[in-house]
C-alpha cells in the first residue's frame, strides 16, 4: 500500500487486523491513505455506494494489538471477494511504522521497507499465540512433546526460523537500526499502549511523582545522563527521581530554587497585569475612534455593522473578532467591551472628552488644509490637485484684524453696550481686496436692513433679538410669518436703497448729462437719471417708443420712483399730473393711490382683478411696440400681474433690477385667502434662487475661476437662506463664512445644530427638515489657524458658542457644555495655563486668566466650579506629561495645596537623587502671561507672578512655594502634616548636598545629625540602631528614596573629616582630635550595623562603601 495511494495491491495471503475495527478484506486494495477510488476503501473516507459488505464475527485479542484500539469489535466490513486485508496505520503489522508487505509507492519507500527484528518477532509470536489459542488442547500437547524430543536429541530451533537472504549492506543497516539513536530518542508510544492495556495511567503516575518535589535535580541534569535518559529527558532509573535527591539538603535546595522561580514568575505576571491596567486606564487610545478617523481621512467607507442579526443567528459560523489583532482593535484584554458599547467620555485624546469627537479639531498651519467636516470638499483644481491658498501673509493679516474686532465685540457684550457688528465686519471686508469681497459687503448691508442696524441713526438691535422668531419650529406660527415678512421687507428696502445710491453716484459722476438743476428733490433726481440714461442710450432698446408729456417720460419717472422705493412720491407725481395721466390712462391714478396707501402694498380684490384684466388685454390686443414698456412694468409691479413671468420685458435692466422685481412681487399672507395664481411668497422665491444657483454658479471650489460664488451667496442671504449660504460659502472662503455666521448668530438668524449630535456635517437638517449649521465646531475648527500663537484670541471665538445657549435655540445646557468642552481642549492643547486660567502673585493671590475674565459670556451658573474643574483636568494633564511647574501653578489655582507640596517634593527628590557632580535637573518654566499686541512677551517686574519668575530649579520652586504657604495660615492648614514634613526634610537634604559639593564636612555632619534619620548619636548602642532602622518604613517615599544618598554623603563626610583630623589641620588638643576620629569611626560602624538591618532595601554598593570605611 502506498502512502499516497494507487500503489500495487498486496498479496492475497496478507491478512492483518485493523486499528479501529476487526480485519477487513478488499477486492481492489488500491485506495490511498487520504481518499478512495471507486473500487477501494480509504482510511478516512467511507466506501462508495457501489461496494457491498458482509459482517463476520471476530475473536477478542488478549494483547490489545491487532484489534480495535477502543475495545473488541464484533463486526467487520468485508467485501465479497477474498483478497488481501487493508494494513493498519498504527499496528505492528503492515503499517507505516512497521514492515509492509506491499511494494513501496512513489516517494514513500522509506516508510514501506523499514522494519526491525523485534517487530518481526512480535508479529510471529502473535501469530503463533493466535494459532495456539485456536488449536485444540491435544495438538498443543503434541507440539510440546515434539519440541522436547528435539531438544533431547540436540536439535536446535534454527530450522524453524526462515532463511535470511540479505547482503552484508542490508544486514549492517538492519543492525544499525536495532540500537538506540543518539540524536533521536526512542518513541515511548508502545510502552504507553502496554501500560494503558494493563490499567496504568502513565500521565497520572508522572504527576503523582512530580508532586513529591524530588525530581528537579534530575530534570536539570537530564542533558548529561546520555543513553540512560528516557525520551522526555528524565532519568529512568528511579521512576523519575534522582538518586541524590533523597537527602534533606538537596530537597531544601530544590525547594528554595522552586520558590524563588515561582516568586519571579508571579512578579513578572503581576507586572504584566499592572502594565496592562496602566495602559487601559491612563493611555486613552480609542482604537475604534482612531480607525474611523483614519477611514474618514482617506475616504474609506467602513463596513456596516448593522448585520448583527446574521451574526447572532449563526454564532458558530463566524468567530468573534473582538479579540483579534485586527487594525484598530486590541488583543490585550478579552474583557474589553465592544467598540459600540464603550463610554463616550473616552473618545478624545485630550483628557477624555465628553463629546463624541474633538470640538476644536486638530491643530494645523494657517492656509489651505483638509476640511474637518465630512460634507465639505477640499479645494482642488480641474486636475484634482490641491489648490494653493492665497498668500498666507494676507490671510494672516486679515485674521488678525478680524480677531481684534471679535475681541472688541466681546468687550462690548460684557459692558452691555451696543455693537454694530455687521457694519464693522463689512468695513474690514471692503478693505480685504478679495474678488468676492463686494458681494460679501453687500450681504452684510442687506442683513443690516433686515435687522434694523442703522449706525447713523444710533439704532442697534439687541443680542439674539430675532432668535425666538427665526427659530420657531412651527412654520405657520405668527412668529415665523412675521420673520418672513421682515426678511422680504429688509431685502426689498436694501435693493431700493442700493439703486438710489447708484442714481446719486451716476448723477454726481456725469453732471452735464444729468443736468439736474433746480430743486434737488427725489423727482428731479429721477428725471436727471432718465436724461442721463437717454444720453448714454441705455434707457430702452432701439426702436422702442416711450410716451411723453410735456417732454417728460412720465411712465419711466413713475417706474424709477417705484424702483427706488419712493411709492408715496410716485403717487404724488401722478396726482400732480392727473390731467395728463387721465388723458392716457384713466384708471392708473386709482391703482397707484390704493397701492401707496396699503401697508402691505396690495390692491383691493376688485381693483386687483380689474388691473390684471387691463394688463392682460393690453398684452394680447395691443400691436407690438405700441405700448410703453415702463407702463406695463408699472402695472406688473402695482397689480402683481402675470406672476409666471417675473421679468421686465422691453427694458434694459441689470441683475439687481431683476432681483428687486422678485422680492417686490413676493408677499407673505394667509395662503388660504389667495388665489392659486397669486401665491408667490418667500418659499417660492427661495426655490427660484436655488434653481438659479444650480444652473449658473459654481458648486465647488474647483469650479470657481472668477469669484462668482460671492454673487450666489449674496442672493441666498437676500432670500433668507442663511444656513445654506454659510454652508455654500465655507468651501470657498471659510474665514468669511465663519464671521458672517457669527453676525447672524448674534442676531438669532442662524439655526444651530444640536450640540449632542454625533454628526460631523457642516449643514444638516433636523426632524422638521429645517436646515441647521454646526456652528460650535465651525468656530472650533477655525481657531486651529492661530490658537497655538494666540490662544487668547481663540478664547474670544470659542465663547461665542454660548450665543446659542438661550431658550430660543433650545438645549442651552448642551450648547454651554459644548463651549466649556472647547475651552477645556484649548487649555490642554495650548498649555498656556498662566494666560488662560490664571497666575499666582508672590503672596499667593491669584491673577484671573482670560477664560475667567470671559466668565459672564460663557453661561456659567457656578463659575468657580467650572474653573476649578478645568483647572484640575489641566493640572493632571500637565503632571502626567512631566510639566512640574505647570502642575504646581494649576493645582495652586485649584486650591489643592496638598498636591502642590507632593509634586514639589517629588521633583525635589529627583533633583537630590542625582549624583554629585552631575548637571542639576532643570524644570520647564511656566509660559509667561504678559504679552503685547504682537504676541511677544513684555518685560515685567521680576517676581510679580509665578509665570514671570521663570523658575526652573526644583529647589527654588520648593522654597518659593513653601515660603508662600508658611506665611499664610489659610494655605498651611490645608496641607497634610506628612507632606509638610517630607518637603521640609527634602529641603534640608538639598542643603546637605550643596554642602557636600562645597567640601564643608563638619557642617554637613551637623545637618545630617539634625535630620535624625541616621543613627549618628547611637555610639554603638544596638537598641538605638534598631529603633532607627524600625523608623525607616515610616519615612515618606520621596525621603526614603534619598536615604542611600544620605548614607553615602555621611560616609564621605566621616572619611574626609577623619583625613583632615589626621592631617594635623585641627588646632586643638591631640587627645581631642583622637576622640573625634574615634567618634567618626564609630559613626561608620553604626551606619554599617544600620544598613545590615535594611539589607534588602539599600543598594549593594552602599554596603561595600561602608565596609571600606569601617576597615579604614
Swiss-Prot record:
Localisation per UniProt entry? Nucleus, Nuclear pore complex; Nucleus membrane
What does the subunit section of this Swiss-Prot or TrEMBL entry state? Component of the nuclear pore complex (NPC). NPC constitutes the exclusive means of nucleocytoplasmic transport. NPCs allow the passive diffusion of ions and small molecules and the active, nuclear transport receptor-mediated bidirectional transport of macromolecules such as proteins, RNAs, ribonucleoparticles (RNPs), and ribosomal subunits across the nuclear envelope. Due to its 8-fold rotational symmetry, all subunits are present with 8 copies or multiples thereof. Part of a tetrameric NUP192-NUP170-NIC96-NUP53 or NUP188-NUP170-NIC96-NUP53 module.
Segments for region (Disordered): 1-74, 101-136, 303-350
Output one GO MF annotation.
Answer: structural constituent of nuclear pore
Its annotated function is as follows: Functions as a component of the nuclear pore complex (NPC). NPC components, collectively referred to as nucleoporins (NUPs), can play the role of both NPC structural components and of docking or interaction partners for transiently associated nuclear transport factors. NIC96, which is localized to the core of the NPC and the distal ring of the nuclear basket, is required for de novo assembly of NPCs.
* Regions of compositional bias (Polar residues) in chain numbering: 12-29, 101-118
What are the protein's UniProt keywords? Coiled coil, Membrane, mRNA transport, Nuclear pore complex, Nucleus, Protein transport, Translocation, Transport
Gene Ontology BP, a term: poly(A)+ mRNA export from nucleus
Q: Which family does it belong to?
A: Belongs to the nucleoporin interacting component (NIC) family.
Its gene is NIC96
Its GO CC terms are: nuclear membrane; nuclear pore
Name assigned to this protein: Nucleoporin NIC96
